[in-house]
Amino acid sequence: TSCCSTVLIFPPTGAGAPAFQSMSVLEGDTTVWGYCPPGRGQRLLEPGIRTIGEFVSNFRSSFEIPTGPLILAGVSFGAMLSFVAANILENDGIFATRLVALCGQSPKSYRGEREGWNLERARQRMRSYGLTPKSILNSDESDDLFVRPTLDDLLLAESCCGNQLKQIHVPITCVSAIDDKIVSSEEAVQWREATSETYRLIEVTGGHYAHEGFGRREWLNVFS
């Protein structure tokens, strides 16, 4: 990347900008924007985004195209949202420099199937994934501040149907953690089908949220 590059990165389910604290090492190398509108990580009790149609509308109205190269990226479900964003931009004749999918299921794995998510199931999922400390989940404010945004994201994810999205004309870099217990390595291979351009696979260790342990060298490698 160069100093004029902008990275627009989408957080994992229920997470916000703090999920990308490790990217602070990129200061001076690139500009980083975390995409966290209502329902995508803000903890201010706004109505959540629960359908992909709402997400598309929100993205179109809120995103200003930067000058210079634009890299789209996302972690876990955020990788799918970065792919949706690439489709939106291409429909408007705007092409990103690269898409970086970090430990995310491939677009074809999103089939628009209803899974019956509710607050209790969302809370159980948060406990099993381990991204949110149990002490926070047990607090009185946890439902409104943490569980509800996660539920919004889960409902948003189940409204996605990858077969309805076109193959993008942007190079894809796929980061796969070989010790990821949530997303299999086969998903990384299937990302190859999501682009008509070049595909690059980077294998790392550190589990599903391996990006949290990245330093400057690792981040620059995945964005190069």
Predicted segments, located by residue:
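Short, surface-exposed "cap/lid" segments of acyl-processing enzymes
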Residues: 1-40
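Gly/Ala-rich beta-loop-alpha elbow adjacent to hydrolase catalytic centers
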Residues: 74-78, 82
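Catalytic histidine-centered segment of alpha/beta-hydrolase-like enzymes
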Residues: 201-217
